[in-house]
């Protein structure tokens, strides 16, 4: 048995260094939508082979299997997904998907081609300098696609609502009678639909888009809620729901984005979510900057939004909504969630006493969330 995938953020040396000598051929693949370039090193003879393919993954798999074995291949994670990874594993070729942000590149290298990129990946693989990403299962990947479709719809809805508001603002309408985008707000908007034909046509176009986006969002919400209640992700969603600010939709999204929480510690989860401060230190100088923002942006946004709920006063007795979520979780998770809610609120109190800006305090709160309030079995 060679490389065993499944954990993220660690060099493949931590998985298969004892079996490194078992592999004879190291393959680097530069994968694009329509072309794939391969570079292979025979570690026994030192021979380097190169090949260019179209978009047919079967050709890549056949070429890789024709090389002296055993073989191990790598390519960068990206928009092409993990189909090639799965095909290679099925054919008997070990494969690791590299984290693009962790690839080492010479600062003086100003020539980038597909062939050079494939050779670079091959070389890093042979030198054991690849940082692997966690490859989700097919079920996890499809659930993640569902969640991200909902996120795309949310952004579309927010954008078209802004466009409709700006259209009305340019014609002198400002709504200041309560919360926006309620039934009352909708009735008020339609009362200001009048005007010339061009304005009414523009209004109707944006209004129809709003209605369609709301319907699409609600349809996705129902699908996510149903999946959260009866799927392999249900236990994790129920445990996450013990925290304030983690609804069913948020809990399901976090469950499918992070998948295996136990691969992280309290310190590494912050780095994965890019909630740790950037640093520029040298010698006696130490300078900290804003958060790195290099990790999973989807999970980070969810946690930052959920952290705002801990700013409110903490009550030992949960609300009816939170109690309903607690009833679905194990007792250990309930106790862990209660302790986490209290600790996160006390963090907010401490930040307020130090006169920290709310936006800064809110980002600092989820950075240590996993350490004291992560899901419990």
Question: What are the functions of these language-model segments?
Answer:
Residues 1-377:
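A detector of single, family-specific signature residues
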């Amino acid at each position: 048995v060679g490389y065993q995938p499944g954990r993220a953020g660690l060099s493949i040396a931590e998985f298969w260094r004892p079996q490194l000598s078992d592999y004879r051929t190291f393959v680097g693949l530069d994968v694009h939508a329509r072309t794939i370039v391969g570079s292979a090193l025979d570690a026994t003879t030192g021979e380097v082979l190169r090949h260019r393919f179209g978009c047919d993954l079967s050709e890549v798999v056949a070429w890789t299997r024709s090389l002296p074995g055993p073989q191990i291949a790598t390519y960068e994670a990206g928009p092409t997904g993990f189909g090639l990874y799965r095909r290679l594993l099925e054919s008997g070729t070990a494969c690791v998907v590299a984290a693009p942000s962790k690839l080492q590149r010479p600062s003086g290298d100003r020539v980038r081609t597909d062939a050079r990129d494939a050779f670079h990946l091959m070389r890093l693989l042979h030198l054991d300098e690849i940082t692997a990403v966690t490859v989700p299962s097919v079920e996890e990947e499809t659930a993640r696609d569902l969640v991200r479709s909902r996120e795309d719809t949310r952004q579309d809805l927010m954008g078209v609502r802004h466009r409709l508001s700006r259209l009305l603002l340019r014609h002198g309408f400002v709504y200041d009678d309560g919360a926006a985008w309620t039934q009352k707000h909708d009735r008020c908007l339609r009362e200001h639909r009048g005007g010339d034909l061009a304005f009414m046509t523009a209004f109707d176009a944006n209004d129809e888009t709003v209605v369609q986006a709301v319907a699409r969002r609600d349809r996705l919400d129902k699908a996510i809620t149903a999946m959260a209640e009866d799927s392999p992700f249900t236990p994790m969603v129920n445990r996450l729901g013990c925290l304030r600010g983690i609804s069913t939709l948020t809990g399901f999204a976090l469950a499918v984005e992070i998948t295996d929480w136990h691969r992280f510690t309290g310190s590494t989860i912050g780095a994965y979510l890019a909630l740790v401060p950037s640093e520029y230190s040298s010698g006696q100088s130490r300078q900290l900057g804003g958060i790195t923002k290099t990790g999973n942006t989807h999970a980070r946004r969810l946690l930052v939004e959920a952290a705002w709920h801990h700013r409110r006063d903490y009550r030992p007795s949960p609300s009816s909504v939170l109690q309903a979520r607690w009833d679905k979780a194990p007792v250990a998770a309930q106790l862990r969630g209660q302790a986490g809610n209290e600790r996160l609120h006390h963090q907010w109190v401490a930040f307020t006493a130090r006169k920290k800006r709310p936006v800064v305090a809110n980002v600092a709160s989820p950075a240590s969330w996993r350490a004291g309030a992560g899901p419990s079995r």
